[in-house]
Structure formats: structure tokens, C-alpha cells
Amino acid sequence: MIQRGHFNVKSLNDDMSEQIFHTYLESIDGQKRYFLQSDYREFAKYMYRIDDQLIELDLTFFDLTYKRLILRMNEVESLYASLLSRPFDFEKKESFDMDYEEQLFPLSQTSRAEKWRKQLKLSTLSVLYDKVQETEKKEEESTADYVSPSWVVLEEEARTTTRENMEDYFDLMNDLERKDWFDTVSYTHLTLPTILLV
């Protein structure tokens, strides 16, 4: 059941609709890790209609984005284990742009997979760096019978840690219900109408 909250209908206009659109997408996929450009183009058709939908208590835009987000998250969830199943090439120089605000959504599933590969490589490298530092410290402090783990072992442990972190992340995401995602609309920094799912 949907209940209409108290809000000033005059404040809902195309400008507010555009703000809600951008803020909502930022809150559910701000790092542009799930949606594709084709999704964004489809969502953009609603950019100036959200105000009307809120007034009419029409959840078409929310339903579309919610279902697509779940689909895209499932696609990525099935991808990360494969990307972490083999060692990364840390000799290859690559860059990873973390200025998500300026980025576009990935053009295709292939470009999204490449983005995830780089993100997972960066995460694994960070864990690996910590493991190497820890090993070097143990070498300095230990007795002669301490045997340092090899690079291969440390790299595999780092990938395992990254995989476990991803498993925890997706477990958390999978525990969220539809209403939790719907609440994302209401918790933006904007003054939105109160629309409750009961």
C-alpha cells in the first residue's frame, strides 16, 4: 500500500525532477560499477517525469531502476570470482580513474568487466602491499629459522582476501530488500516528498 505524505506539490517541477534523478543514481551506483550506458539512456527518459510520477504515486522509474540494478549486480557477482581466479599481471602498467563523478557508465558488459578487473587488481595490490610489509617486518624481527612466504603465496593470499571481501559485500547487498532500495530515494540530500511503502 502506498500512502501520500505531506509535501508542497509546487516544489516538484522539472528542475527538482532532474536533481532527484541524478542524486538517486549517484546514491545507488555512484561509482558506475553496475549500470551500462544503455541503462542510463533508458533511465534518462524519466529525468523530467519523476516529479509527475511522485505526484501520481507512480513507481515506474523506481521499479525500472531497481530491477535493472538487481540484474546488473547479479551479472557482476558472477564475474568477480572469475577475475580473481588467476594472478594479476602487476608488471603491466595500468591506470584506474577514481574520479567517478566525471566518468560515464561503461559502454558494454566487456568495458564494465575491464573496469572491475582493474578495481579488483587495485584492491588486491593494496592487500598485497600490506602483506609484503608485514612479511618484511617479520623478517627483521625474527630468528634465523623464519621462512618468508613466496611472492606467489602472498599474491594468492591477497586475491583470496579480495575475494572474501567481495563475498561479504555481495552478501550484504543481497540482504537488502526492495524497500531498502526504495528508501534510498527518500534519504537523498534533497527535500523529497514522503512516500511510504507499507
What would you call each of these model-derived segments?
Residues 7-12, 150, 154, 173-177:
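Short acidic, glycine/proline-enriched loop segments that cap or flank alpha-helices
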Residues 139-152, 156:
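Long, low-complexity, polar/charged, intrinsically disordered or flexibly structured peripheral segments
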Residues 16-17, 21-24, 65, 69-72, ...:
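Stable alpha-helical elements in mature extracytoplasmic
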Residues 1-143:
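Cationic-aromatic interfacial patches
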Residues 1-6, 162-172:
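Short amphipathic alpha-helical segments and their helix-coil junctions
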Residues 188-194:
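Conserved small/polar residues in nucleotide/adenosyl-binding loops
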